[in-house]
Curated annotation (Swiss-Prot):
Essential cofactor(s): [2Fe-2S] cluster; Mg(2+)
Reactions catalysed according to its record: (2R)-2,3-dihydroxy-3-methylbutanoate = 3-methyl-2-oxobutanoate + H2O; (2R,3R)-2,3-dihydroxy-3-methylpentanoate = (S)-3-methyl-2-oxopentanoate + H2O
Role according to the record: Functions in the biosynthesis of branched-chain amino acids. Catalyzes the dehydration of (2R,3R)-2,3-dihydroxy-3-methylpentanoate (2,3-dihydroxy-3-methylvalerate) into 2-oxo-3-methylpentanoate (2-oxo-3-methylvalerate) and of (2R)-2,3-dihydroxy-3-methylbutanoate (2,3-dihydroxyisovalerate) into 2-oxo-3-methylbutanoate (2-oxoisovalerate), the penultimate precursor to L-isoleucine and L-valine, respectively.
Enzyme class: lyase
Cofactor binding mode and count: Binds 1 [2Fe-2S] cluster per subunit. This cluster acts as a Lewis acid cofactor.
Annotated GO biological process: isoleucine biosynthetic process; L-valine biosynthetic process
Pathways per UniProt: Amino-acid biosynthesis; L-isoleucine biosynthesis; L-isoleucine from 2-oxobutanoate: step 3/4; Amino-acid biosynthesis; L-valine biosynthesis; L-valine from pyruvate: step 3/4
Active site: S480
InterPro entries according to UniProt: DHAD_IlvD/Edd, Dihydro-acid_dehy_C, DihydroxyA_deHydtase, DiOHA_6PGluconate_deHydtase_CS, ILV_EDD_C, ILV_EDD_N, IlvD/EDD_N
Species of the source: Clavibacter sepedonicus
Residues bearing the modification N6-carboxylysine: K128
Gene responsible for this protein: ilvD
The protein's name: Dihydroxy-acid dehydratase
């Protein structure tokens, strides 16, 4: 076996007389003669002060750097962006959310390639920064470890009628709808506002950030047990230090990201998402990460795995508990062990510890599933996984639904068609949405939006208006991990690409059958052909800047909305 090169790339900037100028610059940032033989490790963080999700990352990056030093490497920290979906929701800012995933992946690749760094510790806290970092790791195929910022603790609110309850950010969106509908006072809305974010950390339910943190651990790209501890918990500092040590160990063993992110590892990640009832955004992100890892992952893989993995997590937005509770009952490893014991995971996949997933779990003192936060395997919430991919005449390339919260097997109703989210929100506010309606929001796809906005504002308003179980919402956009109600997104092809959704008219009958995984427009083909005559999409909303570039490059949601 050939000897492992501990400096597979940084020799370009440290060795020989040609590296004189770069060594001089590296001396200015603290390196010395004793450091030239050490692997250089990029510590990439999406820390910022815009949102509580990322506040722990500056602290954790310092811990990771200490771990790199302890492991025999030399850390070099750099930053990247992060967009807060919670702040960007419901207005123009949401166009930029999914775009930020690509910017993060591209920016990390750019620095890692330009500076010839040998490996990386990647730290993130917000929804799109997690997949962005994992995409970068897969694209670069260097030794890499991912570390999550951790989630926020739930808030506690006492309302004017004396009732008290636990609240998260999602309660605010639903409370806005209730206030507009006249079923909640402005006073109680303000009380909820002040309670939802009691400190640092990502949104606390099994929303997108916690789903993707669980994905990273299930993929083997994060240390075992590192996804669930809260942001403020000092165990995160331990995991930060260990992550820094781990990446140097991976270089010594010659293990790179694609050695870990195999097809079997992606199947493990999907299984964990299904068991938790995680965010539908995981479908989009896993497809994109797999593409970077050169793994052939398809929408059909999600249904295949959902058919055999039960939904076990009684977790918000549809359930009762949050990530802190998952941590309390043993974290992601407890769920992985139960799935492995049931023959539902591949135990021989490699992980960032340098050991297999089975070896990691066997080395941990893990409890059984608690039966409440995470139901027992023989007593699931649903017999199949929490996400389904639908196909049919309205979504030939697919659409995604969170079956974990879909209360009906079949829904059929008349279409109410809106060009973009704002028009639908106005109709709801003005009382023009009725029970039984199928709300169709189009031109919100990856290209047509552009940016495939999340629809949390409208879904929260629908629930707040008391219509959450009585109307169906369809869109070529997507949904927040915190969305509840009868919602189907990621419809492909999207409207701007002449997908069937572009030709739906008010009053058309639409039918969804969850068990059959079908989504159909009940209009005959001759009528649809007539509607296609002379059709043209809405003109581009942006003609310059990052969104204009994105719209020209982005692929279908069925391919993960990738840009490469």
């Amino acid at each position: 076996m050939p000897e492992i090169d501990m400096k597979p790339r940084s020799r370009d900037v440290t060795d020989g007389i040609e590296a004189t100028s770069s060594r001089g610059m590296l001396r200015a940032v603290g390196m010395g003669d004793e450091d030239w033989e050490k692997p250089q490790i990029g510590v990439a963080s999406s820390w910022n002060e815009v949102t509580p999700c990322n506040l722990s990352l500056d602290r954790l990056a310092q811990g990771a750097k200490e771990g790199v030093h302890a492991g025999g490497g030399y850390p070099l920290q750099f930053g990247t962006i992060s967009v807060s979906d919670g702040i960007a929701m419901g207005h123009e800012g949401m166009h930029f959310s999914l775009v930020s995933r690509e910017v993060i992946a591209d920016s990390v690749e750019t620095v890692m390639m330009a500076e010839r760094l040998d490996g990386s510790v990647l730290l993130a806290g917000c929804d799109k920064s997690l997949p962005g970092m994992l995409m970068a790791a897969a694209r670069l195929d260097l030794s890499s470890v991912f570390l999550y910022a951790g989630s926020i603790a739930p808030g506690w609110v006492k309302l004017s009628d004396g009732t008290e309850k636990e609240v998260t950010i999602i309660d605010a969106f639903e409370a806005v709808g209730a206030c507009k509908a006249g079923t909640m006072s402005q006073e109680d809305l303000t009380r909820i506002e002040k309670a939802i974010c009691p400190g640092e950390g990502a949104c606390g339910g099994m929303y997108t950030a916690n789903t993707m943190a669980s994905v990273a651990e299930a993929l083997g790209m994060s240390l075992p047990g590192s996804a669930a501890p809260p942001s403020a918990d000092r165990r995160r500092d331990y995991f930060a230090h260990r992550s820094g040590e781990a990446v140097v160990n991976l270089i010594a063993k010659g293990i790179t990201a694609r050695d870990i992110m195999t097809k079997e590892a992606f199947e493990n990640a999907i299984s964990v998402v299904m068991a938790f009832g995680g965010s539908t955004n995981a479908v989009l992100h896993l497809l994109a990460i797999a593409r970077e890892a050169e793994v052939d992952l398809q929408l059909s893989d999600f249904n295949r795995i959902a058919d055999r993995v039960p939904h076990l997590g009684d977790l918000k937005p549809f359930g009762r508990f949050v990530m802190n509770d998952v941590d309390r009952v043993g974290g992601v490893p407890v769920v992985m062990k139960a799935l492995l014991d049931a023959g539902l995971l591949h135990g021989d996949v490699m992980t960032v510890t340098g050991r297999t997933m089975r070896e990691n779990l066997e080395a941990m003192d893990l409890a059984d599933l608690d039966g409440t936060v995470i139901r027992k395997m023989d007593d699931p919430i649903h017999a199949t996984g929490g996400i389904s991919v639908l196909h049919g005449s309205l979504a030939p390339e697919g659409a995604v639904v969170k079956t974990a919260g879909f209360d009906l097997d079949v829904f059929e109703g008349p279409a109410r068609v809106f060009e973009r989210e704002r028009a639908a929100m106005d109709a709801l506010t003005e009382g023009r949405i009725s029970k039984g309606d199928v709300i169709v929001i189009r031109y919100e796809g990856p290209k047509g939006g552009p940016g495939m906005r999340e629809m949390l504002a409208i879904t929260g308003a629908i629930k707040g208006a008391g219509l959450g179980k009585d109307v169906l919402l369809l869109t070529d956009g997507r949904f927040s991990g915190g969305t509840t109600g009868l919602c189907i997104g990621h419809m492909a092809p999207e409207a701007v690409d002449a997908g069937p959704v572009a030709f739906v008219r008010d009053g058309d009958r639409i039918r969804v059958d969850i068990a059959a995984r079908t989504l159909d427009l009940l209009v005959d083909e001759a009528e649809l052909a007539a509607r296609r005559e002379g059709w043209a999409p809405l003109p581009p909303r942006y003609t310059r800047g990052v969104l204009a570039k994105y719209a020209k490059l982005v692929h279908s949601a069925a391919e993960g909305a990738i840009t490469g």
